[in-house]
Structures are given as C-alpha cells and as structure tokens.
Amino acid sequence: MQTWQLPEHIADVLPTNARQLESAREQLLALFRVHGYELVQPPLMEYAHSLLTHIDAGLSLKTILVTDRLSGRQLGIRADITPQVARIDAHLLSANQGINRLCYAGPVLHAQPDGLLNMREPLQAGAEMYGFADIRGDIELIDLMLKSMKIADMGKVLLSLGHIGIFRALSDAAHLDAGQSATLLALMQDKDTGTVEAQVKAWKLDGMWAKAFSLLPRLYGGREVLSDARGRLPDLSAVGGALDELQAVCDAFPDCEIHIDLSELRVDNYHTGLLYAAYAADFHDAVARGGRYDGLGGYFGRARPATGFSFDLRSFIGRLPTSERQPAVLVDAEDAEAAREAVEALREQGQCVVIDYGIGHNVSEELAGRLKKTDGVWQVVKR
C-alpha cells in the first residue's frame, strides 16, 4: 500500500473546496444565529452508551467503537450529532424549561457509507428546536432548511413530506406487535403493494386495517394526496391530526413545490411524527432531512418535544458558490524584516501578505501588488 493512500470513501479537501466549505459554513451559522439558534460543539468522541441511544438501531452499525486507554471503557466516534444535542438539552441546558434553539456544524464519521456515492466523513450541519410541540415549530425549521439550501446554491428545491404518526396510529389500532410493525415498515419503503397485501393477509388482520396498510404505499403525489387520504383512511383522531399537520405545512409554503408520501417512514430511525426532506436537481438522494423526534432526550433523563434537520455540507461541494482567494501582496524576503510593521498593519486590515522567497508560491496569480519602499514609505506597488 502506498503511504499516501486513504481509506475507501475518505478524502482530503483541498484549498479551493475548503474555502467554499468554510464560506458556506460561516454563512449557515450566521443564518442560524439571526433566527435565534445558538451554536453548540459536542465532542467528536463519547462513551458508546451515550452515543448509542438504542432508539435508532441503524446508528450502531454506523458508529466506530474504540477502547479508551485511560478508563478501559468503550468509546464511540460520533456518527450523528443529533443524539449529542439531545443530551445537551436534557442535561447541560436543563435549567431552561422553555424552548432551546441549537445548531451545529461539524464532522461525523461512519463505519460504512450511506451509499456508493457517499463519503464516510460527512460535515454535518443542522438546527434543532427543543421544548415546543406545536406544528409551528416544524414550520420554522422547514423554513430554515429551505433558506439553508439557498445558501448552498441548490436552485429549485422540492419539499418532501411524510408523517410516521399515521403508520403508528394504524399499527396501534390494528394491535400489531413490535416485530410486525418493524416488518411492515421495511416493506413500505419498497412500495411493493403486493408484498404488503400478502403480509397483512398472512397475519389475518381485520379487513379495514389490511386495506389501510395496503393503501399507504399508494398515497403519494402532490398536495391533493391529503384530501384523498382523508376520504380513504380509517377515521382515527391520530390520523386526522397528522393530516392536519401536513396541511398546515402545505399552507405555510404556498409557492414551494411539495411532494407528499405517506409511506415515507424512515426505517430504523428515531423520528416520531412529521418527516420532511429537501430534494434538488442532480442529487440522487435528499440534500437535507428532518423531522420530529419527541422524547429522544428521555434517554438522557429529560424527554422533550423536538424537531430539527441536518445535511452533509461536504456533499454540496460541486454546487457551492466559488469562494475566490483574496489577491495577495508580495514582499521580498530581503525586505521582510525591515517592512515588518507595514506588513502587520496590512494583515490587521485583512489583507493577505506573503513573503516571496523567490522559488514560487501557491498564492493567487492575480496579485494585489508588491510591497516596496518608496520615498521612505512602504507602499503597495501595483504590477
């Protein structure tokens, strides 16, 4: 093996792309800040039992585990920042009984990539709201997610909506056990209505519930899906409430293209209600995902309503606006000491000043000039 090789699905970020990422990160955090979201920076590594909440079984497959040489205990390298933020809200910020608005932007590490085209070291950015159960909180986060996509230069974005509460309500009413519910959830993802129908028939479910489960994979499309669902799904209060929430989101974004899929249920995840995602042209999967995950903080001692979204900023590199490097001022190496005061003054003003040792450099070809002493004063002389 060559010493310069990196593991599969791991890559360096070179200067041009690094400038793009850092510029976008700064703009995103500024956007979050003016909406009231405070930055938190959880550690890259924690005790494994804190990272693996046992709510999301899929997370354990993504998490890289190591042994702590200090304590002998098992540590995990984070694969998702959301459980860490839930811990912070539940424990470190527990003095606030009201709403906590929190945001983050940092690397995570996956034991396996999410797909053949995905990296194992995403730069996960996101925003989360704790302590507010009303649909208005979800609408606020969706609005922030869509604004984030504008910063990432995603162009026209399609907003996809779902609601796991509908499936849960039907499962409870049909008295499905945990194993049956998990099986049906997995089948729903493939939209194989034939297999779903065969499965509910094998379980000998009551006809009303069997029909409802078979119908869910067919309930997808535009805003009209909601009225269709109201007329065809069983009249359960939880189902009606979920449809009301979806309608409220649709009404809040009248100019946004919306796709509704009532069988988009995200297997092996911690979401409990409304689900939302953003899709953009030329991306094979959602560019951002979010939803409600009430009670996640209960694992850390304080169950609270919660909603939020996140995305991998590194996956946007090909679409991020170009961040040009500032033209540099050169100063000859033999003049550097004598010009030190002038050099530092320029740098304090934000000007890039590079010492020219005469053997080439990696600064922009478009130079701002060269620092020369003219009439006893150090000045930038244009080329």
Swiss-Prot record:
Belongs to the class-II aminoacyl-tRNA synthetase family. HisZ subfamily. Signal peptide: none annotated. It comes from Neisseria meningitidis serogroup C / serotype 2a (strain ATCC 700532 / DSM 15464 / FAM18). GO terms for molecular function: histidine-tRNA ligase activity. It is found in: Cytoplasm. Heteromultimer composed of HisG and HisZ subunits. Keywords: Amino-acid biosynthesis, Cytoplasm, Histidine biosynthesis. Pfam families: tRNA-synt_His. InterPro entries: aa-tRNA-synth_II/BPL/LPL, HisRS-like_core, HisRS/HisZ, HisZ. The lineage of its organism: Bacteria, Pseudomonadati, Pseudomonadota, Betaproteobacteria, Neisseriales. This is ATP phosphoribosyltransferase regulatory subunit. This function is generally fulfilled by the C-terminal part of HisG, which is missing in some bacteria such as this one. PANTHER family: HISTIDINE--TRNA LIGASE, MITOCHONDRIAL-RELATED, HISTIDYL-TRNA SYNTHETASE. Required for the first step of histidine biosynthesis. May allow the feedback regulation of ATP phosphoribosyltransferase activity by histidine.
